[in-house]
Amino acid sequence: VKSRLLLAALLAALCVPALAAPAAKPKAKATAARNWLTTAGRTAEGAIVIGNPAAKVKLVEYLSMTCSHCAQLSAEALPPLQRDYIARGLVSLEVRHAVRDGYDFAASLLLRCEPPARYLESIEALFATQPQWMQKGAGAAAVPGFDSKSSDEKMLAVARASGFDSFFARRGMSPQAFAACMADEKAQQQLAQMAGNSWERDAIPGTPLILINGKRQEGVHDWADLEPLIRAALK
């Protein structure tokens, strides 16, 4: 019930963007011959995890796709994090979508419909153009008849106005897959529950928020803040 209420609230805010069988035990040490960026899984709550399941460092990021600080951290940290740590099996990354508004919900829903191999790359690409698609999406409310649409219709209109249909099409998502993803009630409920857990159960103070091996890391704003924490956890 809670997730349904949260979902309804998020969809109602579409035009109010936020202010800024067990496998064999894997070896703990990195395997040079394997690129762990191609390994992905999901937690019981549906969060996507990229990397070696037995990585010594388990990194969790709570993020919002409409958070400018998240976009900044992504631009600085994701390339070296993937290349130097996740690919080598040293670190795994779990992404928890702490959705804040309707734009965020539509973007996060579509990202989670991507094949895991494209997931982090698509997050990077969306963050890189965040100001542009947020501005375009705001125009959806000016279209006559918008207010009379259902919540799902509003979300689809905003997603298209934001250019998400063409963005994901360029990355291999067919129009049919796009429409199916946007209409997937189970995926909507799971995402709404993840957002509710982030803000209510986990009581995060804001985004981005980083956990390293289950411990909150305060004051992580860029790669210069994050990398020393990862290195320390690897010792």
Predicted regions and their residues:
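Intrinsically disordered, low-complexity regions enriched in Pro/Ser/Thr
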Residues: 8-9, 171
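Cysteine-centric redox/oxidoreductase cores and disulfide-bonded domains
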Residues: 99-206, 211-215, 220-224, 229-234
